[in-house]
Amino acid sequence: MMKMKTLLALAISGICAAGVANAHDHMAKPAGPSIEVKVQQLDPANGNKDVGTVTITESNYGLVFTPNLQGLAEGLHGFHIHENPSCDPKEKDGKLTSGLAAGGHWDPKGAKQHGYPWQDDAHLGDLPALTVLHDGTATNPVLAPRLKKLDEVRGHSIMIHAGGDNHSDHPAPLGGGGPRMACGVIK
């Protein structure tokens, strides 16, 4: 009888654990249509290097950007949608600048100011900052509540900037972020 109770207890705990794991899997991943964007670390001198992907998924709350990145510098980084579908370098003031062909922050409504992703008077391409852990990985999803459909972002690029983002143009323009460090074209 004791063996039977032990087996029953193990079976019940196994079923419960499987149910919890299954529920977690469904909660952790948005279920809508999605596209995967390949991301490269920008290095015009030595060639770009693959650092992973960002999956963009439609949800009831807006577009969810789920990074699966590695090999990046630890810390918070500016994370945006840029105007053009290019990650190529471009010359500015006689100097080759990484990712400059991507253009500026995507601003189809002409807001002309940097801000939070939920702010109606900010660039539509302003996303929450990307968190990179001490081991160089980024896996925390971010939500863009004003963006609803994948077709809105196709034909643009995802840009990761060195350094954080204060979601303002003050004291420094465009959130005070640094150079463009990684990019992916949204197809």
UniProtKB/Swiss-Prot annotation:
The lineage of its organism: Bacteria, Pseudomonadati, Pseudomonadota, Gammaproteobacteria, Pasteurellales. Cu cation binds at H80, H82, H105, H161. Homodimer. Disulfide bonds join C87-C183. PROSITE patterns: SOD_CU_ZN_1, SOD_CU_ZN_2. It holds the Pfam family Sod_Cu. GO terms for cellular component: periplasmic space. Destroys radicals which are normally produced within the cells and which are toxic to biological systems. May confer survival advantage by accelerating dismutation of superoxide of environmental origin to hydrogen peroxide, disruptive to the normal mucociliary clearance process in the host. SUPFAM superfamilies: Cu,Zn superoxide dismutase-like (SSF49329). This is Superoxide dismutase [Cu-Zn]. Residues 1-23 form the signal peptide. Belongs to the Cu-Zn superoxide dismutase family. The keyword Ribonucleoprotein does not apply. It comes from Haemophilus parainfluenzae. Binds 1 copper ion per subunit. It is found in: Periplasm. InterPro entries: SOD-like_Cu/Zn_dom_sf, SOD_Cu/Zn_/chaperone, SOD_Cu/Zn_BS, SOD_Cu_Zn_dom. Keywords: Antioxidant, Copper, Disulfide bond, Metal-binding, Oxidoreductase, Periplasm, Signal, Zinc. Its cofactor is Cu cation; Zn(2+). Zn(2+) binds at H105, H114, H123, D126.
